[in-house]
Amino acid sequence: MKVKFLGSFFEEFPPPDYPEVVFVGRSNVGKSSLLNMVVGSKVAKVSKTPGRTRAVNYFLLDKKLYLVDVPGYGYAKVGREEMEKWRKMMERYFKERKDNIKMAFLLIDAVAGVQPLDEQMIEWFEYYGIPFTVVITKIDKASQSEIAKTLKQVKRYVGDGAIVLSSAKEGKGKKELLSRILN
């Protein structure tokens, strides 16, 4: 797989020349780490500091698909103005790119479970008709009971189908995610 970083975008997004797969979720849920794990190289910047990704980052996969890493939501230390800016940017992204998005991966932390802003993202996906898969992340850091609880929460929204358990650290879920990206 050949991955090329195209840039960070705040206002204008790249031309919709390729289908897009977008990684969405709360701050520090592991979007950049998961993207790196899936493509097998460290193309997306990773930080332990929540709220580090501030722009919509585009990567070109094998000259046929955009992988999109978006800023996380729900970081408490970000001011109200910054949160509103994020909300508007994301709403504009989904509105403008809805026909170009092949798949959205909604990442949910195995320990934290489904949060109200995750529910709002699911509503956005449904409203804009965007196909999505819930990726339960950081299963290496969660107990079996935490994973079971989060799975139960997620199944209320998506049934049994569109769920992948993952650990970027251990490479778990890579095969399923690649299959959903490439098919």
Curated annotation (Swiss-Prot):
HAMAP family: GTPase_EngB. Mg(2+) binds at S32, T53. The lineage of its organism: Bacteria, Pseudomonadati, Aquificota, Aquificia, Aquificales. Residues 17-183 form the EngB-type G domain. Its cofactor is Mg(2+). GO terms for biological process: division septum assembly. Gene3D superfamilies: P-loop containing nucleotide triphosphate hydrolases. It comes from the Bacteria. InterPro entries: G_ENGB_dom (IPR030393), GTP-bd (IPR006073), GTP-bd_ribosome_bio_YsxC (IPR019987), P-loop_NTPase (IPR027417), Small_GTP-bd (IPR005225). Necessary for normal cell division and for the maintenance of normal septation. GTP binds at residues 25-32, 51-55, 69-72, 137-140, 166-168. This is Probable GTP-binding protein EngB. One of its GO terms (molecular function) is metal ion binding. SUPFAM superfamilies: P-loop containing nucleoside triphosphate hydrolases. NCBIfam families: GTPase_YsxC (TIGR03598), small_GTP (TIGR00231). Belongs to the TRAFAC class TrmE-Era-EngA-EngB-Septin-like GTPase superfamily. EngB GTPase family. It holds the Pfam family MMR_HSR1. Keywords: Cell cycle, Cell division, GTP-binding, Magnesium, Metal-binding, Nucleotide-binding, Septation. GO terms for cellular component: cytosol.
